Design a protein with these regions (language model features):
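Tandem repeat scaffolds
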Residues: 2-220
Length: 220
């Protein structure tokens, strides 16, 4: 009997933030470091916060349209009800981060590094993770129009009760990526599914894509 292969789940610790001091979002500056602050009901739209570093911080009801978070670092940080039609954070670093109840239009995270990151109850238009390095990431109860994982490296990434209209896996490298609770309508890069776990229903839905890739003619 063949040995059953188990899919490793993301390792995500609970985020506990205590004794935070009230921070002033308008005073945030690029390449500065911030720790133990809570920023509530703030609008940082259009600000340059590139290279900034945040540790043990919380952002609640923040408007961040076209805010430049390029190469910023977030460690043990929580985002609640974040809103941004355009969210700019390429080459950023997220570690032990929770993003909850947020709405993002175009979210640019390409070439970023994520470790122990949880998205829950979020609505995202285009999530660009091309060339990103993802480890221990969970998407829970999210709706994503387009998820671009082209050339990304993903290990222990899971989706629960999540819908993605278009998923691009072109040249991605997957390990322990659990897609069983993910509803996908369109898939690009089916040849790069190695390392993903799917269920029998999903396999049947993928049959036309697999047949096309392998040059198999389906004819009843």
């Amino acid at each position: 009997m063949a040995k059953k292969i188990l899919t490793a789940a993301p390792l995500i610790d609970a985020l506990l933030l205590q004794n935070l001091v009230v921070g002033d979002a308008k005073s945030l500056r690029a390449h500065e470091s911030y720790s133990g602050e809570r920023f509530a009901v703030s609008d940082v739209g259009g600000q340059d916060l590139s290279g900034a570093s945040f540790s043990e911080c919380e952002f609640v009801e923040m408007e961040a349209n076209e805010t430049n978070f390029r190469a910023a670092t977030f460690v043990e940080t929580h985002f609640g009800r974040l809103t941004a039609p355009i969210f700019i954070a390429p080459r950023s670093n997220f570690r032990d981060v929770s993003i909850e109840g947020s709405r993002l239009g175009s979210a640019e995270f390409y070439e970023s590094t994520w470790k122990s990151v949880r998205f829950s109850h979020c609505r995202i238009g285009y999530l660009n993770l091309r060339g990103a390095h993802l480890r221990d990431v969970l998407f829970d109860d999210c709706v994503i129009d387009e998820l671009d994982l082209g050339a990304a490296t993903a290990n222990r990434v899971s989706f629960t009760n999540t819908q993605v209209d278009t998923l691009d896996l072109t040249r991605s490298v997957l390990t322990n990526v659990d897609l069983r609770s993910l509803e996908v309508r369109h898939l690009t890069g089916v040849e790069h599914l190695k390392g993903a776990t799917i269920n029998s229903h999903q396999l049947a839905e993928l049959a036309p894509f697999l047949a096309n890739h392998l040059g198999i003619v389906l004819n009843e």
